[in-house]
């Protein structure tokens, strides 16, 4: 269903045989808090949809739900009144993706964090030329991320929206083994590592720090994952910058069980700069790390 306005009745709604729900460009006008029962739904997929109500929320009751994909463009993110909270009541989510241009203006909650225990989580936020994200992004991103404390894989390409106070009160990610990050500050990176004690793989899609304090990272207590579980560190879109060099050096010096570190360089990067970058890395590696260094151009 695409591009229309639907008035949602204030009652319990049943779709007893629906297994796949795909909606595009729908504006739902809501008078009260509807509860939508979808007993056999497996896939919930919406693009540029808005659930307009200033006070109430929408509950999606789908016990068999496996896949959630929510995509928003700038118009749907900045639309007023803001979209109300969506609550998923499910028990076996395997894949959750939220992708938007402009941030998050819509709180998304799970009735039970264990519902996503086996999920792969992908959260991607882009500014799309905007000077800043929509105002609610910081709080909504925090609410969304903290609910996935039991998952094994998180891809979070929106790390710059997290603040130090928010990261400090995030729960521990006791099962997290794979973490992918976009641009991130030194403090946020350190806190995420400290809260992920069994982390096996870290991938930096944009390997630079939005805030750079070498003394802070060097003086902080080394996260447990670096001394016991972290085996693979990957850097994508490498340009040979000092931030990338420092991050690599930090992991080589502190990664006691590190086995492999890979670098995927941008195609247009100066070859001489990359060769200099490689030489410095190998000089750090000598006597410090037994990890294999890999380069792709």
Where are these regions (language model features)?
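Hydrophobic, well-ordered secondary-structure elements that form the walls
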Residues: 192, 233, 251
């Amino acid at each position: 269903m695409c591009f229309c306005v639907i008035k949602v009745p204030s009652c319990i709604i049943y779709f007893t045989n629906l297994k796949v729900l795909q909606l595009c460009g729908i504006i739902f006008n809501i008078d009260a808090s509807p509860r939508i029962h979808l007993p056999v739904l497996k896939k919930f997929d919406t693009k540029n949809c808005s659930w307009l109500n200033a006070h109430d929320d929408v509950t999606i009751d789908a016990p068999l739900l496996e896949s959630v994909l929510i995509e928003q463009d700038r118009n749907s993110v900045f639309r007023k009144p803001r979209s109300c909270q969506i609550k998923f009541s499910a028990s076996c989510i395997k894949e959750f993706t939220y992708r938007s241009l402009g941030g998050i203006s819509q709180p998304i909650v799970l009735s039970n964090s264990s519902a996503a225990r086996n999920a792969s989580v992908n959260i991607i936020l882009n500014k799309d030329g905007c000077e800043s994200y929509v105002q609610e992004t910081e709080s909504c991103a925090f609410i969304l991320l903290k609910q996935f404390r039991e998952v094994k894989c998180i891809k979070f390409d929106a790390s710059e929206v997290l603040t130090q106070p928010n990261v400090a009160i995030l729960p521990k990610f006791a099962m997290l083994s794979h973490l992918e990050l976009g641009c991130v500050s030194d403090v946020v990176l350190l806190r995420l590592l400290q809260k992920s004690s069994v982390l096996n793989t870290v991938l930096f899609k944009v390997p630079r720090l939005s805030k750079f304090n070498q003394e802070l990272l060097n003086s902080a207590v080394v996260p447990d994952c670096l001394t016991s579980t972290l085996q693979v560190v990957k850097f994508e879109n490498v340009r040979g910058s000092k931030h990338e060099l420092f991050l690599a050096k930090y992991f080589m010096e502190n990664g006691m069980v590190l086995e492999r570190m890979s670098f995927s360089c941008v195609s247009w990067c100066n070859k001489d700069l990359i060769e200099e970058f490689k030489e410095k890395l190998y000089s750090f590696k000598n006597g410090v790390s037994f990890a294999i260094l890999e380069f792709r151009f």
